[in-house]
A protein has these predicted regions:
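N-terminal membrane topogenesis motif
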Residues: 1-22, 74, 81, 188-189, ...
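Interhelical loop/hinge segments that connect adjacent transmembrane helices in multipass membrane
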Residues: 2-3, 140-143, 167-171, 180-224, ...
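Residues that define the loop-to-transmembrane-helix transition and helix capping
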Residues: 4, 35-38, 77, 81, ...
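Short runs within selected transmembrane alpha-helices of multi-pass transporters and secretion channels
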Residues: 13, 17-21, 25, 43-51, ...
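Alpha-helical transmembrane segments of multi-pass membrane transport and lipid-handling proteins
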Residues: 15, 52-55, 60, 81-110, ...
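Helix-terminus/linker motif at the lipid-water interface of multi-pass membrane proteins
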Residues: 22-37, 159-164, 221-253, 267-271, ...
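Alpha-helical transmembrane segments of polytopic membrane transporters and translocases
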Residues: 26-27, 38-55, 212, 227-229, ...
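Helix-loop junctions and terminal segments of transmembrane helices
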Residues: 55-71, 250-288, 292-295, 341-348
Length: 389
């Protein structure tokens, strides 16, 4: 399938990723309120960290390696089974650590039930094989499946979440969305003639590549999510609710820029692998132009109408999110240029170690500013830390 068709399907996916929150967030924010939204953000973000450890970098590493072998179905299946086996082992181990933490950390024992339900995507994370279809450039399946599952979730949300006490139902619906995605992926994987077998051969070779990508992914996710976790531990769920509404408003629209990058990632890796330098540079130029075209207008838009956006989108109770949103709007430019250099340039050119060093430096600054600013400034401090770091 061509880059243009893949891009269109990925645009469909990202339109659904944008449209779904636009429909659900105003409803959920007004039903649950600031504190419950903050609590939801805390438990889901914490689980995402554990999912990241369970994945061991398979999303980027697996997609890149499958892209290199996409012309050989048998080799693709063999590599899949090796990575899948490693992922099963890591998922079981990390799930065990997660469940232990629910009983061993005081702040978590108070919301143990919510965290246990939110952990469903972690328990079954080995079944998340989006990386396989991404490597094969099967974005049609990824997009249509995601749209279907979001529609199911939307119906469940509107029917079942009616008041503040329904937070646990909201968390359950969110978790089941991941599980349904996993099941559909596995179904089509088997239907297309691929097989699933445990295979630990070449474990050391694959594990080395996974670990390198894992540390890069870990550093990036710490940068993206540590603010939420630190606010949950160092401040209140109210401050977290205010901050999460601001940062979520920005991140909802981030896929507009990253959609082309995800579509081009397998092809860029393939062109680099076969030495097609002309096509490789042509695609990078295209990606850079798209980022420039989208990032600056979005930043200007949110700087100008942040107050009206918060009032309309979240309601009056979220009014304090206006300033954090204006601060976070700078991320449209900063984060997307970082994504371009890190993922589309360094990763596809096999400069993972350089990417890791750059990301770790950013994480250190982000952690430092979070520690300094969150205690005194709360949501505003987390917003500044995200931009500066």
């Amino acid at each position: 399938m061509s880059i243009k068709k893949n891009f269109l399907y990925n645009i469909l996916l990202n339109i659904s990723n944008i449209a779904f929150p636009i429909i659900t967030i105003p409803y959920v924010s007004r039903i649950l309120g600031v504190d419950q939204i903050g609590e939801f953000s805390f438990v889901t973000t914490l689980v995402e960290y554990f999912v990241l450890f369970a994945a061991l970098g398979k999303t980027l590493f697996g997609s890149r390696e499958i892209a290199k072998l996409k012309d050989n179905k048998r080799s693709c299946n063999r590599l899949f089974n090796r990575l899948f086996t490693i992922n099963i082992i890591s998922s079981i181990f990390v799930s065990f650590i997660f469940l232990l933490s629910l009983f061993g950390i005081q702040q978590l024992t108070e919301i143990r039930c919510l965290l246990f339900i939110a952990g469903i995507p972690l328990y079954f994370s080995a079944l998340d094989i989006n990386w396989f279809y991404s490597g094969l450039e099967k974005f049609k399946l990824i997009s249509l499946r995601s749209v279907f599952v979001k529609l199911v979730l939307l119906i469940g949300l509107l029917c079942l979440v009616k008041n503040k006490s329904d937070l646990i139902i909201y968390v359950l619906l969110n978790s089941l969305t991941f599980l349904i995605n996993y099941i559909i992926n596995i179904y089509f994987f088997i239907k297309e003639g691929f097989s699933i077998r445990l295979d630990l051969s070449d474990c050391k070779v694959n594990l080395k590549g996974l670990v390198l990508f894992f540390f890069s992914s870990l550093a990036m996710q710490i940068y993206l999510m540590i603010d939420t976790v630190m606010l949950g531990f160092m401040s209140s769920f109210y401050e977290l609710g205010i901050y999460s509404s601001a940062i979520k408003s920005v991140r909802i629209l981030m896929p507009i820029m990253t959609s082309l990058g995800m579509v081009m990632l397998p092809r860029l890796s393939y062109c680099n692998n076969i030495g097609n330098v002309v096509e490789y540079r042509k695609m990078l130029d295209c990606a850079f132009d798209v980022i420039n075209f989208c990032s600056w207008p979005l930043m200007a838009y949110f700087l100008c109408i942040a107050d009206l956006f918060i009032l309309f989108f979240f309601g009056q109770s979220f009014g304090e999110a206006t300033l954090p949103l204006r601060i976070c709007s700078v991320l449209f430019v900063v984060s997307n240029f970082s994504y371009f250099l890190g993922i589309q340039v360094m990763t596809t050119a096999s400069f993972e170690s350089r990417y890791l060093i750059a990301t770790v430096c950013g994480v250190i600054f982000n952690l430092l500013f979070n520690v300094i600013l969150i205690p005194s400034m709360g949501a505003r401090g987390a917003a500044w830390a995200s931009v500066i770091g």
